[in-house]
């Protein structure tokens, strides 16, 4: 039997589509049938954070079934998740797994993080003074007014960034000022850094929505509120990215009394359903992704076998 002959496999798709379980099943399958162990490299931005476990549906050590997982629990909640830093760390993890004879499996649904790991792209640098100036403008004017300013300077970028997304608006203005080029010019091109097979898990919309609703209920039952309370004591509110994570932001609002816990749970489910649609739209725009139907009742091992069938093989000597 030929060996899988590809340097990197990515399992992508929306939240609650079953990526994590397929990643574990694929890792076992590779070792059992090909003698080449698979190791997972996380590509979920919020799973980078230590202690953000319940609300991110992070696999427990037992659920990882002995499969090595990289880039989980590498940031404190007070740290900002930066895609450029992730890119360097993910590429280092891929090279490490490969050097030891394994097959790296990039697993996650954070679209830009996946692209940063698999594609040949370079992110513009940042300047703290320029960033601080635009953030001060954001604080005074608000995101909608700053979005109007971006529209004057870079209409193409403004058309792709929601008026309420202050962080991305600031970044687009910063990049434009530093490079003198449109923000879109710095976005990733679809050119692989190394040969890669990307596989997306496609779940019917109604089924995915139901999975998300059930997952949110399980998170609350599993202690999400207590997890957020613990992380609050460790500086969660100071974290620019961690404090905005779905579920965590809503529970913090409940702590503040601006919403009830029931309302926070319902809002988390609604926003997660919306987020899943955005994730799928992102990955659907990439024609290189091979989509596998993954409806309710799909066996992760069966899906892993179908992923394996998509991989090019090298003939045995």
Curated annotation (Swiss-Prot):
Residue numbers binding substrate: 15-20
InterPro entries in the record: Dimethylallyltransferase (IPR039657), IPT (IPR018022), P-loop_NTPase (IPR027417)
GO biological process: tRNA modification
Gene Ontology molecular function terms on file: ATP binding; tRNA dimethylallyltransferase activity
Reaction catalysis annotation: adenosine(37) in tRNA + dimethylallyl diphosphate = N(6)-dimethylallyladenosine(37) in tRNA + diphosphate
Enzyme Commission number(s) from the entry: 2.5.1.75
Site positions per UniProt: Interaction with substrate tRNA: 110, 131
Gene3D superfamilies: 1.10.20.140, P-loop containing nucleotide triphosphate hydrolases
Keyword terms, alphabetized: ATP-binding, Magnesium, Nucleotide-binding, Transferase, tRNA processing
Record has Cytoplasm as a keyword: no
Residues noted as binding ATP in the record, renumbered to the chain: 13-20
PANTHER family documented for this protein: TRNA DIMETHYLALLYLTRANSFERASE
Role noted for this protein: Catalyzes the transfer of a dimethylallyl group onto the adenine at position 37 in tRNAs that read codons beginning with uridine, leading to the formation of N6-(dimethylallyl)adenosine (i(6)A).
Protein name (record): tRNA dimethylallyltransferase
Organism: Kineococcus radiotolerans (strain ATCC BAA-149 / DSM 14245 / SRS30216)
